[in-house]
């Protein structure tokens, strides 16, 4: 997605060898017009696949997921990273390791929001090592629902997340694919959408 790549080049900041900071439009402050375009692109790609739910993980996946769900006219569910007192029964959980935060969290979704009839599109902000998507897949499959595809806003192609997910049989479609960081600049691979 050319618009996204241009925004990454303009406002993204490289930290160290493998972290891209995009807090001015995705991971802290949200550019809703860009998120709306992201949602439209994902929705156009998956419009004929029978998607019934969009699922993401809090927090930075929520914005692109909600705009995708809006464009598809289906509900969006986000997995919570912390259990609260209102989630006391009927909870589907999985362990997820965060590459950026370097911690493992138990993420959860109330089972009443997913059913065996659901065809789910996972949307997330980043794909690095694939652990967030893997955790969401586990939760979705615990409910008996089907993962149709995984939509990623920014993929770190130099990490093994895509390979892990595709080898397990899940299609991955990314709007921006980072090949590497070179001389303080992002180098892109050809994106899927």
Curated annotation (Swiss-Prot):
Its main location: cytoplasm. Its EC number is 2.4.2.22. Keywords: Cytoplasm, Glycosyltransferase, Purine salvage, Transferase. Pathway: Purine metabolism; XMP biosynthesis via salvage pathway; XMP from xanthine: step 1/1. GO terms for biological process: purine ribonucleoside salvage; xanthine metabolic process; XMP salvage. GO terms for molecular function: xanthine phosphoribosyltransferase activity. It catalyses: XMP + diphosphate = xanthine + 5-phospho-alpha-D-ribose 1-diphosphate. It is an enzyme of class 2 (transferase). SUPFAM superfamilies: PRTase-like (SSF53271). It is found in: Cytoplasm. Xanthine binds at residues 20, 27, 156. Pfam families: Pribosyltran. One of its GO terms (cellular component) is cytoplasm. 5-phospho-alpha-D-ribose 1-diphosphate binds at residues 128-132. Homodimer. Belongs to the purine/pyrimidine phosphoribosyltransferase family. Xpt subfamily. NCBIfam families: PRK09219.1 (NF006671), XPRTase (TIGR01744). PANTHER family: HYPOXANTHINE/GUANINE PHOSPHORIBOSYLTRANSFERASE, XANTHINE PHOSPHORIBOSYLTRANSFERASE. Converts the preformed base xanthine, a product of nucleic acid breakdown, to xanthosine 5'-monophosphate (XMP), so it can be reused for RNA or DNA synthesis. This is Xanthine phosphoribosyltransferase. It comes from Streptococcus pneumoniae serotype 4 (strain ATCC BAA-334 / TIGR4). The gene is xpt.
